[in-house]
Amino acid sequence: MTASATPASSLSTPAQRLAALRQAMKQHGYDAWIVPSADPHMSEYMPEHWHGRKWVSGFTGSVGTLVVTATTAGVWVDSRYWEQAAAQLAGTGIELQKLGKVRSHVDMLADTLHEGAVVGVAPDMLSRTAQRQLQQALAPKGVQLKAETDLLDGFWSDRPPMPTAPVVVHPAAFVSETTAQKLARVRAAVQEKGATHHLISSLDDIAWLTNLRGSDVEYNPVFLAHLLVGPDSATLFVNDTRLNDEARAALRSAGIALAPYEQVADAVAALTGSLLVDPLRVAASTLQKLPAAVLAVGEGAAAAGSLPAGATTAGRAAANAANAAAGASGAANASDAAGATNAPAATGQTARVQLIEAVNPSTLFKGVKSAADIAHTREAMAQDGAALCEFFADFEARLQKGEVLNELQIDELITAARARQPNFVSASFGTICGFNANAALPHYSATPEQFSEIRGDGMLLIDSGGQYLNGTTDITRVVPVGTPSAAQKRDNTLVLKAHIALSTTVFPDGIGGPLLDAICRKPMWQHQCDYGHGTGHGVGYFLNVHEGPQVISWYAPVLPHAAMREGMITSIEPGLYRPGQWGIRIENLVVNLPVAKPEETDFGTFLYFDPLTLCPIDTRLMDTAMMTQEEIAWVNRYHALVREKLAPRVSGAAKAWLEARTQPLPG
């Protein structure tokens, strides 16, 4: 790559970086350049090496797409980030584009670029599905898409290096299925799809299959790798210097060979037979050495189950978990999309392998937890609940003494409380701690440059979680500071009613998660209130806190592979946000279990949500006059469960706090 003429040392502001990108575009013949929020594994959360959108634009939200032309620049984000993006983009020359209010970036490019224009994007930041959708939208307008190189390499001189952290074995005490057993299940599913080989690039799937864990992505115990599974062998493409002897031995015993991370595209190009790929979770760069005739598969129409052109980002955002929704938007039954098979390529190459597109089988296998996984997770939830009792008792005591805390200190205190629990590894995501108006930003993140002190009257929202060797937690609670207003209690009670409505729902096994969303929102809709994010996402087992395939969001498509199944762990997290005033969200994790004593058996299996999260919901913010007797009874039952499970684990001030916060509501 030819370096930009702009000295890298001068690129200290988004405006300067934007100018450098435009200069590189001009040098290399691009009329527009796209910087998505992605990496070669289509991860929701990525190593810093691929945070190019953040580096150029200054917008630090986890999801967004930067598009730059010679005269315009914009970042497309969903409603969760509108306020944050407006503040961070001010003065940069980059405009906020509100998804849902404006045309998509794909439509903008198709509508405004002239015939013969060239749009560029780094091939390792573009999924096969996104590449196809862009091509389908741009080609009719005579606009060419090139995904060949990364222009940022030419002027991002201090780009963070690739991660090199150790890769370790997930302790056997917490593993319910061996890698060999998991591979056998995957191979059987691959064979059912008519494929001989399967390429997996999604990091959580690879970690789950290999029973290995890493720390390449902050908060997510995954590591950079690709996994190629054949009928009788498998190869892990990874920097093998990071594997200790135990990890190497575990892979050998499962029949998994090692190869350099960078060689995956060559290995794919050398395959014969048929290759199953998930088009939403494999990068264009991984397949770019295949002949054109092979890559033409599915280009006549979007793969089954994929989103409309330009809708991928919005679909992910609507699911309140980019990666979770991406998994839920894949081509579940797309083996029939592999229409063009072994035709010779125009270059004279022979197409040696046929592409078959479908969701990774491991995505569903991973999403359905075993009985042992659920038991381990219950223990992790109890540990987490005990830590939260200690934290909240300490927090309230500090406030009563007149100590002034800030949002950053809350994060430190809650992480320290979790760290005292057995098997704790790290937080499961960056803590969202927002006081009053800050909580109105669903993905607010306090920074050393911008945070609020907890003083005066109001409400404090804390959305946090932990990674334990025996499970992953995610919980949101809102607590009063000083005296809450009647309006705050009303809003909190509406959110609570929504939470209870879904928590008490019985539903058919196999129903689409998006169909459940209206049940949760109904109590709020009746008062003309709503929230802009999804209601629920899947959660991993000592893996990503956002996991597919299931999602509870009416914005997401209803797809067969993402149906609600027994053993899935999902969040229930309705919210209500008043910009400039306050924000409320109440979140528990639940597991799908079959109804124990069904009244009927003629209509199939029915499931219910069994609570996993153990922490009081603050009754000081509840207006019982707005609640039914059934809702009051639910709160009392839940608090009795919390008290029963946590009382033996806490003592002193934490136990006193638990007792006080789980006192039954009258009625």
Language model segments and positions:
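Active-site neighborhoods and metal-handling regions in enzymes and metal-associated proteins
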Residues: M1-G667
